Amino acid sequence: MSVLCIGQCGYDIIFSIPGLLPENIKLRITDKLELPGGPATCAAALTGKWGLPTYLASRVGDDIFADAILDKLHQFQVNTDYVQKIPGANSSMSMVIRHCDNANRTAINYPGTLIDMELPLPPHYDVILTDGHELNTALDAMQRAPHVPSVLDAGSVRDSTLLLAKKVTYLVCSEVFAGSYCGEAIRLDDLDKLRSQIASLRSMAPYVAVTLGEQGLIYEENGHVFHLPAFPVESVDTLGAGDIFHGSFAYGIHEGMSFPDALQLASAAAALSVTKVGGVSSIPDRDQATILMKNNCQKNRILF
């Protein structure tokens, strides 16, 4: 039994600053983190930490950052045999500015100089999670194992995420993706419009959920749409919360949880993650997420 995560792999350097980033000054900071980044990579770190045999299919450069990424992933028990090092290439990197006053962040990404290539795949896997990067590899993985449940972390509307949204079992998208695809922002106070928006998303995949940050999430099941509030926590950093959400959701699906229960577990894991700084460094223990889910179970509310 194993999980295959397919997508972006990079190196994050995180600086924490008070307030917004002003122009034309020099700041001295005392907090710095360097970690593997990328939605699929962070999700793989979670499923590996939670004890599932986990494969990551991705690309890195031929540099010191690639070595640091792979070393850290091994600490999370992630199998990196299918992460390809591209000779002479630079790894993807992100400079992340964490705004201490409001727990938000600003990320500046350098995609690296990685050539496109179809990646090798493990011979067997039981759940697929893709973030829209490495499109051809994701399509190949689903074609090879058509009965394996697949999850799309759809953060934004791109050609790749639109194509994959119509192929996967579970479309778990951000409100940015949903709003862009539907042509208008998702609002919980306009049920008529929301009904149409969910129907539009639902036409692409059998299962649909939209994450709404502090407002929780909405999902469709058996013709009804439900709202699941977020767990009440004090947020200090939102970096990686969505990736951790998707990784723990994939874990729940792997473990045979129902769609709503997997979303509850994912919400609990994401809530715990924002109480710490960093992406993979904020992944909670599985027992912590399970306890929060059971002891503070958020009641879903039927919207229509």
Regions found by a protein language model. Name each.
Residues 126-193, 215-217:
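Conserved beta-alpha-beta core of the PfkB/ribokinase-like small-molecule kinase fold
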Residues 23-27, 34, 49-127, 290-304:
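Conserved N-terminal subdomain of the carbohydrate kinase-like
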Residues 3, 53-54, 80-81, 149-150, ...:
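Hydrophobic anchor at the start of a short beta-strand
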Residues 1-57, 64-68, 235:
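Glycine-rich phosphate/adenosyl-contacting loop at the front of the ribokinase-like
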Residues 9, 133, 244:
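Active-site metal-binding loops of divalent metal-dependent hydrolases
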Residues 10, 31-34, 112-113, 154-158, ...:
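Short, acidic/turn-prone active-site loops that include or flank metal/cofactor-
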Residues 184, 188-304:
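Conserved phosphate-binding/catalytic region of the ribokinase-like
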Residues 120-121, 164, 171, 201:
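Structural alpha-helical scaffold elements that stabilize or flank donor/cofactor-binding regions
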